Amino acid sequence: MRIAAILVAGGSGSRFGSDIPKQFLPVGGKPLIRHGAERLSAKVDLLQPVGCADDIAPLLQGLDHLPIVDGGKERQDSVRAGLEALVPYAPDIVLIHDAARPYFPDHTIEDLIEALQIHDGAIPAVPVADTLKRAAGNIIDSTVPREGLYRAQTPQAFKFSVLLALHRDHPGGATDDAALLDQAGHSVALVPGAEDNIKVTYPADLARVERSMSISMIPRIGTGYDVHAFETGRKLILCGIEVPHHQGLAGHSDADVGIHALCDAIYGALAEGDIGRHFPPTEASWKDADSARFLRHAAERIAARGGFLANADLTLICEKPKITPHAPAMIARLAELLGVSIDKISVKATTSEKLGFTGREEGIAAQAAVIIMIPA
């Protein structure tokens, strides 16, 4: 069974009152859109973002997703564009998720998929708890019974072929996809939603999300250390870039000592072992491998745990080559691989004052520390 997700990132956020669309505003240390994208990418086979590629692409760096497609004037136009883009991949199930919803529980997708064994669609929903009033202006006209009323949330799940056919048969669709199925006589199930699954529409919503995340996320600290000896005849790769030097570093992979230390720090913070556990040096498949693959995997593990990288601090220890001239490029590359902004990454260098193997210019050592926020 192949599962795809459409991440709808259109809309200008006019009700939010900001020049920046709400889905691009920072919350919990990263753009709003990235929270949902990371949670989806850890659960589905295909992630299809819909919106302005120039705006979205930088915010999704490091995540595995399909080429971004342009959205439409209305939300349903954007969903249709995402569905058509998924046709060549023939998914069995498609999830539709609003980029303005940064959080949903891990069990939501499992609940939705289970419901699709019987129904053509399923949505998470929360029963309406407040008393509802119908009014004309500021004058109450009547009380609306709340029994049987629910607040719909996303992600919503549908059988791909059913939803695609309905969008093609009804251009413009309905106000939402569940309504489209309901109007066509298809059954749509409700699964339990979550009060924390907040859609950011107004400025106060952003504050609610920030408070919720600060309460539900806890910091995890990890450290990593690695060392490689110099070896003639190899390129010197440090923090994902090639550094001019007359020697490279010896190792089974490309021997990127900086990335290796950083990976160990991340795995340590997640209590998931070290780089050797995930990429054993005894396996031929990792011979001369680009260590960027290792760091991308570490970033994916953060996302799979529903967390985010708060910051990373890396120190390279060597007499030569000089690191400082290359530090900005190193920071940019690490930020790209981890899918974070450059202000979350620090790369600096020191020497051992001519002492030890680094002092004798026999190799390079690296020390890393990270703080990762994960759900409590």
UniProtKB/Swiss-Prot annotation:
Keyword hit for Lyase: yes
Binding annotation for 4-CDP-2-C-methyl-D-erythritol 2-phosphate: D226, V227, H228, H252, S253, D274, I275, G276, T350, T351, S352, E353, F357, R360
Location of the region described as 2-C-methyl-D-erythritol 4-phosphate cytidylyltransferase in the Swiss-Prot/TrEMBL record: 1-220
Database matches in InterPro entries: IspD, IspD/F, IspD/TarI, ISPD_synthase_CS, MECDP_synthase, MECDP_synthase_CS, MECDP_synthase_sf, Nucleotide-diphossugar_trans
Lineage: superkingdom: Bacteria
Disulfide bridges in this chain: none
Sorted UniProt keywords: Isoprene biosynthesis, Lyase, Metal-binding, Multifunctional enzyme, Nucleotidyltransferase, Transferase
Reaction(s) the record says it catalyses: 2-C-methyl-D-erythritol 4-phosphate + CTP + H(+) = 4-CDP-2-C-methyl-D-erythritol + diphosphate; 4-CDP-2-C-methyl-D-erythritol 2-phosphate = 2-C-methyl-D-erythritol 2,4-cyclic diphosphate + CMP
Name used for this protein in its record: Bifunctional enzyme IspD/IspF
Organism annotation: Granulibacter bethesdensis (strain ATCC BAA-1260 / CGDNIH1)
Upper classification of the organism: Bacteria, Pseudomonadati, Pseudomonadota, Alphaproteobacteria, Acetobacterales
